[in-house]
Structures are given as C-alpha cells and as structure tokens.
C-alpha cells in the first residue's frame, strides 16, 4: 500500500469568488467537504494550508491539521513548499496536492495519483480524462494534455492538441461544425491533481518560471521545461466540476443538497 500525505491549499482571497473555502455547501464549508474526501482516500495525513486565520479556525473546528502560510505566494506549489519546510516533511514522502475548491473530488483518484507516482520513475504524476465534447476541446479553460504511448507527458496546453490538420481544416470558417466532430482517444483533459515527492517541491520553486508556463499560464510546464518527466494516467472516476465561479458553486450545491 502506498503511503502519502495530502496538502490542501486553501487561499481565501479568490479573485472570482472571495472567501471561497468557507462557502457553505449542504450545511458545511467547502473546505470541510474537500477535507472529508481527502480523508476517505486513505491518506496517512491531511493538512489544510491557508493564508487566512478565519479559514484556519474553521478547519481546526472540524478536526483538520492546519499550517498557516504566507499571503504572498504566487502559486499553490509555493504554498506547498512552505508547508513541507515548516513541518519538516521527509524528502521522499509522497505529497498529493488537492485544490481547496474540489468538494466533489472522488477519493479513489486521490489514491490513484499517489500510486501513479510510486509506480513510475518521474518527478510528478497527474491524471486525465478523455475529451468527447468538441466544445470542451476548443475551450481554453479546459487544459489539454498530450502524452506518449506510455503515458509520459509531451505537453500541456489550453489549445486543442494534437491539431488534426485534415479534420479541423474547415473549422476557422465553419465553427458550427464542431459539434459534429468525432474525437479520437488522443484528446485528453488534464485534471488538476498532482503527486510529487516533498523534496521535488522544494526543487521546483528554485527554478525560474519558464517562458512556456507564462504564455499558457500553466505552472506544470515548468517541470517539462527543465527536462523532468510527468506521468499521466486516465482517472478511474471522472471528477465532477470544481468551483471557480458563483455558477459553479450553485451547481455543486444542487448536487450535494439532493
């Protein structure tokens, strides 16, 4: 059995939904739902990493271990690195990063991503799902991932990759035809859940941001830029929507309040 620790970055000052970790869903704050899913995964330890005392107080109230972090971090990975350093987590410990806005994340895939890292000689592991809806393929908010035959990542992009030259040739002029496209299994949507060793998190933040990650606004591209490997598996369960907007929050409420 793979041992792993889950860290949940829970930033209070969300641009689109301020106070998001504390948003009430089915009688509980969102962060409580995420914590419960993480606990159900079989993680040996689950830590809420936050920059806000109110989030910390609420999390402690439902029994979570909390690590207070800086308000100045530019990414969730930087926040994880502070937790690893503050708590003295061993360098070979597997860390799974679950975003604090994923109250519906299936516990099975939390364990799956940890096992994925343990199985392969890579610095980072993640998950993906097949894209069957052409509109999702062309949506820049849905991050696409392209892998080789063994699941090692070639690239992440907000663009539709790979670009099927013949199949997509008419799309710029006839966008209405997108719904008629039949997509192959090569098209994958990346799920934003990661596993890495604690020591690699500290290495990652020493690297300067890469040109590609700045262009795409995808921090995982830094790993590829510096020549390291990421392995991606198909998720055993397709995770429902995360919460980025007020509309997403209402969708999740309707699911959990049934």
From Swiss-Prot:
It catalyses: 3-deoxy-alpha-D-manno-oct-2-ulosonate + CTP = CMP-3-deoxy-beta-D-manno-octulosonate + diphosphate. Activates KDO (a required 8-carbon sugar) for incorporation into bacterial lipopolysaccharide in Gram-negative bacteria. Pathway: Nucleotide-sugar biosynthesis; CMP-3-deoxy-D-manno-octulosonate biosynthesis; CMP-3-deoxy-D-manno-octulosonate from 3-deoxy-D-manno-octulosonate and CTP: step 1/1; Bacterial outer membrane biogenesis; lipopolysaccharide biosynthesis. GO terms for cellular component: cytosol. Its main location: cytoplasm. InterPro entries: Cytidylyl_trans, KdsB, Nucleotide-diphossugar_trans. Keywords: Cytoplasm, Lipopolysaccharide biosynthesis, Nucleotidyltransferase, Transferase. GO terms for molecular function: 3-deoxy-manno-octulosonate cytidylyltransferase activity. It is found in: Cytoplasm. Its EC number is 2.7.7.38. This is 3-deoxy-manno-octulosonate cytidylyltransferase. GO terms for biological process: CMP-keto-3-deoxy-D-manno-octulosonic acid biosynthetic process; lipopolysaccharide biosynthetic process. It is an enzyme of class 2 (transferase). Belongs to the KdsB family. It comes from the Bacteria.
